[in-house]
Regions:
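Thiamine diphosphate
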Residues: 118-174
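Short internal beta-strands
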Residues: 111, 116-119
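Cofactor-binding active-site loop characterized by glycine-rich and histidine/acidic residues
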Residues: 1-110, 128-134, 139, 144-146
Length: 174
């Protein structure tokens, strides 16, 4: 399976196999960092054949832009008949971007095995949630695309695990 973290999801990258030393070298733009010193952020990934990769895409900064990227990645899983799922993290601000909506719609229509985790930070940069959307909950936006949505308290690790596992299992089933 493949995931695409946000810049705040360093823990997810570590779970997928990135090492603290690797991350520090990346931040310092060292020649032996994952991007060979060409980038001094955590915008690096490791994706390729399922057996040869740690399975995480490098992040890109614009809000919501990884959703259509992951929709395309997961479409390729379907086209090749691979039993793989893609998971993408976005912040609440990303749900107000065109790229987010295009990616969600594309994934839904093509039945891509994609799971989107929306982290509600309460603010997108300096914009409060109340100025972004009139939806009572971000999962309400899923209804418009005909896809299921679940909610969990992000501070409850077990609840997040349970919701994520259900979503991944559902995506894998098609």
């Amino acid at each position: 399976d493949v995931m695409s973290p946000l810049i705040r999801n360093l823990g997810a990258m570590l779970v997928k196999g990135a090492t603290p030393v690797e991350v520090l070298k990346q931040y310092m733009a060292k020649g032996d960092s994952p991007t060979r010193g060409r980038e001094l952020n955590i915008h690096f990934g490791d994706i390729g054949e399922a057996e040869k990769t740690r399975g995480f895409l490098g992040q890109i900064s614009p809000l919501g832009d990884m959703v259509p990227v992951m929709a395309g990645v997961t479409l390729s899983f379907n086209m090749r008949g691979e039993d793989r799922v893609g998971l993408v993290y976005v912040g609440d601000g990303a749900t107000s971007t065109g790229a987010f909506h295009e990616g969600i719609n594309f994934a839904a229509v093509n039945r891509c095995p994609l799971v989107v985790i929306v982290e509600n930070n309460g603010y997108a940069y300096s914009t409060p949630t109340s100025k972004q959307t009139l939806a009572k909950q971000f999962i309400d936006k899923a209804i418009g695309y005909g896809i299921p949505g679940e909610q969990a308290d992000g501070n409850d690790v077990l609840a997040v695990y349970d919701v994520t596992k259900r979503a991944v299992d559902r995506a894998r089933r098609g």
